């Protein structure tokens, strides 16, 4: 999720530079709702249901790998790839910097393939026809520098911005979320997200529970977002909150609608944090092994908490990072109160 969201300002800049261009996006199926509302057409004139791109090409690589030798898998892959090539793209842009994405960009049929000169995975650059020396410390700024090269005009870093609410608006989902919140007395709420991609980035669930308890005492309903396989994580938060925390989980479209209404978001370096930042929701970001200067929340009011003892690493360790354990729940509550104007 985060990689997609970090690309949106670059897309916004390209759309501004080429307002009449047909822009498509090749994306994993599980993240397609960030670009197009469920059930909406994935190609054609842009609308509130698909506001930024003219066409969404979704691939389900995870499922395809599980049934690699199935005829139906190859048929689905061929259908997607025929759609990509039939679109007649002249330029492909790889902002992920992975071998997989670079190869797909080269095979798209586009005559020109842009990418960073020093991508995330070094061999990816072998597939680019034009390599851009990316500048800027934050990944959003680095992505924008590639867009600058394509547009051949300067898009200054201070102008880096997300389009105002860049995500699809499904009115039925929006109405349902609003009704559900009202029915459960959660008109004023904080959204907490204790999960993360791997254990080293995960602040202890018990401390999220303590934060939830403090927010409830301050008059905010603490809603806890969690995904499949994170049920035990929520139960630990609930227990530590003294029963104050309330669960919420659902589709990406539902998470977007919920996040739009949050007073504040609290979580670590994970997709929902960057979603909240893109929606300009104030965030308290709890960082450990990843560098907030490169991967932190961007474009919103924020307080980033990171211990001086944390060491930048992308090793996917299961145990919590030592420096992150030095951040107490009271520090998070102080940051939340500051952003909420409660001090």
Summary of predicted features, one role per range:
Residues 1-343:
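Catalytic machinery of carbohydrate-active enzymes
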